Amino acid sequence: EFPAAEPQEAVAHFLCRLSVETDCADVHHALVNHEQDFILLHVVGNPEQFARRHVPGALHLPWRQITAERMAHWPADTLFVVYCAGPHCNGADRAALKLARLGLPVKIMTGGITGWEDEQFEFASHTLVSAS
């Protein structure tokens, strides 16, 4: 019913997709081999959830809090890799859209937390310190 795309059309499609996506294995490889050329953003949840479990090296910046002022802390050519809870969550898409609208390079880490867990990669955690 749906014939395969012509090879050149398939190449264009996959190049386009890979220009806006990465996966858990590629992010893990970059982290363990000290080849990280991106800022990893955990874009959903609250600080307590992030403290309990997140991808090592990630910063917690919920997508609703992404603003030009916040992102001005990084050089304009910084690549951001965003992730959320998993395929059932659209937080990474929302974050990526906001970052792209700000003119910043961005990719989504497909799979998110669920994908990271499925790959059996280790999570980071830390204890929150109360201000009181």
Language model regions located:
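Short active-site oxyanion
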Residues: 34-40, 56-57, 79, 105
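Flexible, polar/low-complexity N-terminal or interdomain linker segments that lie immediately upstream
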Residues: 1-48, 125-132
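Short, hinge-like loop/turn segments at secondary-structure boundaries
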Residues: 59, 77, 123-127
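Short loop/helix-cap segments at secondary-structure boundaries that form the rim of catalytic
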Residues: 50-56, 116
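Catalytic cysteine-centered active loop of the rhodanese-like fold, especially the PTP/DSP P-loop
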Residues: 69-117
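Glycine-rich, highly charged phosphate/nucleotide-binding loops
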Residues: 61-69
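Terminal peptide-recognition signature
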Residues: 27, 58, 99
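Short, charged/polar "capping" segments at the starts of alpha-helices
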Residues: 47-50, 90-91
